[in-house]
A protein has these predicted regions:
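Solvent-exposed N-terminal domain segments of exported/luminal and surface proteins
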Residues: 32-43, 47-187, 191
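Core of folded catalytic or high-affinity ligand/protein-binding domains
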Residues: 157, 170-216, 222, 230
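Extracellular/lumenal glycan-associated surfaces
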Residues: 123, 148-150, 199-212, 305-319
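Short loop/beta submotifs within extracellular cysteine-rich repeat domains
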Residues: 131, 211-216, 318-323
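Extended, compositionally biased non-globular segments
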Residues: 231-233, 238, 242-329
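C-terminal motif of bacterial Sec signal peptides marking the signal peptidase cleavage site
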Residues: 23-26
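A mature extracytoplasmic/lumenal domain signature
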Residues: 127, 156-158, 207-209, 239-241, ...
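Bacterial N-terminal signal peptides that target proteins for export
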Residues: 3-16
């Protein structure tokens, strides 16, 4: 890289990151793209249902609740969440305050302060997997809620146009949607929980909620259910059985099936300034390249569902949390 280009990159990064202090840090772009394909894989197991069809979650974590003061410096208030199951519906009422340590908010790249929210969501207890996908997040609707009552919103409102000079972390007017976690050109001020704060004070996760996973006892020797998706299917953290329909198989870290695009568009902003992975459009689903489908999920057995159920995973690589759901809404 020549000296002139190197200086341009440094100046561009400084100006963009400084501007972030004054921008509205919005999340959940409605311009995100996802190549949707039908997942035709099935499992053959005598104790499993088919890979498409209905399941029941009515006996699982229906009375999960938490109500404790969080003395983390940037919180200093009570975290409250209550889950309940009635009839065919799972309900959550929470104040959106995390139950674990958080980073410093406001911070130089996220000017917002954590505050209590009104969280009230419902999910079916009998989710039905389909062959189609539905994009979620941001204006499309809540993708899922972690058990502590904090919402999942993996996308951002940041974007760039086709040039190298016009990017915003908040207005979502460009053709290229900026990722929060898979790049280091832009900073959205996320903490060690892969979370930050929206202008309304809403703390939310873009990726693995490390503090909550730790509180749940998550590690390489256990599957850890951490959230419910909008379609009613469960979301697990990081680890799953190496053989999807065999609970006696070793646990392994689940890998997504998203890869960097193989062909770069001529109108994409310079890769020298914005490396592959910076934008949502830099990723494509390659069936069979990982363990999971286009919604970062699969059908298989879990500790809570020994007969098998479709379920999602939070992963350490893109898409981190799924951007779509496979169940009926």
């Amino acid at each position: 890289m020549n000296h002139s280009l190197s200086n341009k990159i440094k100046l561009l990064k400084i100006s963009l990151l400084s501007a972030a202090i004054f921008s509205i840090v919005a999340c959940g772009s409605d311009e995100q793209s996802l190549k949707t394909v039908t997942d035709e894989s099935t499992l053959s197991s005598s104790n499993s249902t088919t890979a498409t069809g209905s399941s029941s979650t009515e006996q699982v974590l229906c009375e999960y609740s938490y109500n404790e003061y969080n003395d983390s410096t940037s919180v200093q208030t009570t975290s409250s969440t209550d889950w309940a199951c009635t009839g065919t519906t799972r309900y959550v009422v929470a104040n959106g305050i995390p139950d674990h340590d958080v980073g410093t908010f406001p911070n130089p790249d996220n000017p917002n302060t954590i505050s209590e929210q009104t969280v009230s969501e419902s999910f079916t207890l009998t989710p039905i997997q389909s062959d189609t996908t539905t994009l979620m997040g941001g204006p499309r609707g809540v993708l899922g809620i972690v058990l502590n009552g904090v919402k999942i919103d993996a996308g951002t409102g940041g974007s760039c146009d086709d040039s190298v000079d016009n990017c915003s972390l908040g207005d979502n007017s460009g053709n290229w949607s900026i990722e929060a976690l898979s790049q280091d050109t832009f900073s959205f001020g996320t903490d060690d929980n892969n979370a930050h704060v929206q202008p309304d004070g809403s703390y939310h996760y873009h990726g693995m909620p490390e503090g909550f996973v730790t509180l749940r006892g998550g590690n390489s020797s256990t599957m850890t259910l951490i959230a419910w998706a909008a379609d009613g299917f469960p979301i697990y953290a990081r680890y799953g059985y190496s053989t999807a329909d065999d609970a006696s198989s070793p646990l392994k870290e689940m890998t997504s099936s998203y890869q960097h695009i193989s062909t770069v568009s001529d109108n994409r902003p310079s890769i020298e300034i914005y490396p592959l992975g910076t934008f949502v459009q830099d990723w494509e689903y390659v069936a069979g390249s990982g363990d999971l489908d286009e919604c970062n999920g699969r059908f298989g057995v879990t500790p809570e569902f020994p007969q098998g159920i479709y379920h999602y995973y939070a992963t350490d690589t893109y898409p981190f949390f799924q951007r779509c759901v496979k169940g009926e809404l």
